Amino acid sequence: MEAPPVTTMPVSGGTINMMEYLLQGSILDQGLESLLHRLRGLCDNMEPETFADHESVYLLKGQQASPFVLRARRPLDRPGAPWHLRYLGQPEAGDRSRHTLVRNCVDIATSDVLPEFLQEMGFRMDHEFVARGHLFRKGVMKVAVYKVFRVLVSGAAEGAEPLSLSYLVELSAVAPAGQDNIADEVRGFAEQLRPLVQLEKIDPKRVM
């Protein structure tokens, strides 16, 4: 999947603190075409992108209670495209009535020596998977509908097998901190996808 769009807002005193507003759900294989048809009608007037990404999750264990996590991913369908390094912060506690999960998000393009660099820094790969699916856009929002594949032999993404009989659905938007009105937009769009898919706030710690 592509990195979040570059913001045109001025930067003062360093980089902009970007936040991801996220809702997630799943849909059975037999419901995929109906959902894709609905998304084509609701999203921007352009053909949806397809993607096939190989993602590895790296951990750095220290004195803190939980390890520091970074994600390295590379596109399998675009040879020569850059790798991406992604950091996803812990969900903000904040107001329980907030319509989406909100977390800090950093996504940068890197060279193909990223895995070696992370290992030299002391990170160890925890797990890896392949994600294949479709990407739709609606303004600042994007909808990823994808199937997760289990990598049977480390590094051999080509032989990956489907993990389940369903597709994950992620509706997200990335924006500078403080723009909580985006959460309302994300929730409003999610309502338009019912009853095909139920998108909710899912705490990653509860599914690990």
Curated annotation (Swiss-Prot):
It is found in: Nucleus. The keyword Nucleus applies. GO terms for cellular component: core mediator complex; mediator complex. It comes from the Eukaryota. Its main location: nucleus. One of its GO terms (biological process) is termination of RNA polymerase II transcription. Component of the Mediator complex, a coactivator involved in the regulated transcription of nearly all RNA polymerase II-dependent genes. Mediator functions as a bridge to convey information from gene-specific regulatory proteins to the basal RNA polymerase II transcription machinery. Mediator is recruited to promoters by direct interactions with regulatory proteins and serves as a scaffold for the assembly of a functional preinitiation complex with RNA polymerase II and the general transcription factors. Component of the Mediator complex. Belongs to the Mediator complex subunit 18 family. This is Mediator of RNA polymerase II transcription subunit 18. It comes from Xenopus laevis (African clawed frog). The lineage of its organism: Eukaryota, Metazoa, Chordata, Craniata, Vertebrata. The gene is med18.
